[in-house]
Amino acid sequence: MRHYEIVFMVHPDQSEQVTGMIERYTGSITEAGGVIHRLEDWGRRQLAYPINKLHKAHYVLMNVEAPTEVISELETTFRYNDAVLRNLVMRTKNAVTEASPLVREEKKEAPAA
């Protein structure tokens, strides 16, 4: 099985459905024998440029180890889901398990607040 980093952005009006989407996607990966190494829900964030006249989106990051068939099925699901504005699936060499720089930065700021 190969390692992948998956980021997808959800329409801000569909933020309540993100947990269900994550459960569905992680469920399909684990059913096929895959492993979720890292799952981060970055929440609603400002976009660098407007997409479909939207300025914010709900971001989710996953690092997984899964068969290629599951990843292609996941990409098809992203493509036909209107709530997913953009997605990126990248193959990585190793499993990434440590927190992303974005989450580490938020953890640093949290104690000071």
From Swiss-Prot:
Gene, per the UniProt record: rpsF
Alphabetical keyword list: Ribonucleoprotein, Ribosomal protein, RNA-binding, rRNA-binding
Keyword flag Lyase: no
A Gene Ontology term for the protein's cellular component: cytosolic small ribosomal subunit
Annotated family: Belongs to the bacterial ribosomal protein bS6 family.
Database matches in SUPFAM superfamilies: Ribosomal protein S6
The keyword rRNA-binding is annotated on this UniProt entry: yes
UniProt cross-references to InterPro entries, sorted A to Z: Ribosomal_bS6, Ribosomal_bS6_CS, Ribosomal_bS6_sf, Ribosomal_S6_plastid/chlpt, Transl_elong_EF1B/ribsomal_bS6
Protein name in the entry: Small ribosomal subunit protein bS6
